[in-house]
Amino acid sequence: MEEDLMEYAPNIPDNVLELIFSFLKLQDLRNCTLVCKSWYRFFCDENNEVWRAQCLQKVPAEAFKNDLLTVVPTYKAKLRAYFHAWNPFDCSRHVYIKPNGFTLHRNPVAQSTDGSRGKIGFKHGRHAWEVRWEGPLGTVAVVGIATKDAAIQCHGYYALLGADDQSWGWNLVDNLLLHNGDAHGIYPLLNNAPKYKVGERIRVILDCDENTLSFEKNYEFLGVAFTDLPEKNFYPTVAAVYGNTEISMVYLGAPLDG
């Protein structure tokens, strides 16, 4: 039976493959890519009907009602971004994840700094994700990375992300880089570097091969922010203090050079 499958699998028309694969669970699709080159080629089309069906089935409809997912143009990329989005079980109790699955909302709680981590951490490879802050920044608005051991909430208005040796962050309010409770200089290294404006796109670039963390703003590379990162599992993380502020995060995959 297995030999018959291997013989006929490469010759099955794409429209028949779409019908067959539409009945499979997402976790089974990867195994299908290993059957033959023809099936692998089929799944390389990230906008085919199978990826479309999986995407529309799993990604909340709310996520498609604005331009949030335009940075990930294919159905497969949108699906992947959803599985990397904010973790509703790994955030401050003063934060909730909106129905679109990609945006967190900080409730207006006084004297609290509140954060959230992404669902999936990274220890190998190169990864990029986009962060967009909606609403006033307040006195603290930090974007960066953290391990699972970093605190995600604290009393007072405090640069929580970067406050210990388990987190690294860039405070968009004063352009300071933060780690282990210390400021590591102004970023980017420009005279009178412009401050972040609400709604601008921040792209975080984590290179686990070179152990660096970098940022882009509005598609302009700002330089390497942190070097010599330890070999740990890092999660996309933010920390905020302003009530009713909202922060969206969309995972992009491997960054494009140039």
Curated annotation (Swiss-Prot):
Family annotation (InterPro entries): B30.2/SPRY, B30.2/SPRY_sf, ConA-like_dom_sf, F-box-like_dom_sf, F-box_dom, FBXO45-Fsn/SPSB_families, SPRY_dom, SPRY_FBXO45
Keywords per UniProt = Neurogenesis, Synapse, Ubl conjugation pathway
- CDD domains for this protein: F-box_FBXO45, SPRY_Fbox
Instruction: State its location(s).
Output: Synapse
A matching Pfam family? SPRY
Pathway(s) annotated for this protein in UniProt: Protein modification; protein ubiquitination
Q: Which residues form the B30.2/SPRY domain?
A: 64-256
Q: Looking at the UniProt record for this protein, which Gene Ontology cellular component terms does it annotate, in alphabetical order?
A: neuromuscular junction; SCF ubiquitin ligase complex; synapse
Gene3D superfamilies (UniProt xref): 1.20.1280.50, 2.60.120.920
Q: Which GO terms describe its biological process?
A: negative regulation of synaptic assembly at neuromuscular junction; neuromuscular synaptic transmission; proteasome-mediated ubiquitin-dependent protein catabolic process; protein ubiquitination; synapse assembly involved in innervation
Keyword Glycosyltransferase in annotation? no
Where in the sequence is the signal peptide annotated? none
Ranges for domain F-box come to 6-54
- Which family is this protein grouped under? Belongs to the FBXO45/Fsn family.
Role: Required in the presynaptic motoneuron to down-regulate the levels of wnd and restrain synaptic terminal growth at the neuromuscular junction (NMJ).
Q: What interactions and quaternary structure are annotated?
A: Component of an E3 ubiquitin ligase complex composed of hiw and Fsn.
Indicate what this protein is called per its UniProt record.
F-box/SPRY domain-containing protein 1
- What gene is behind this protein? Fsn
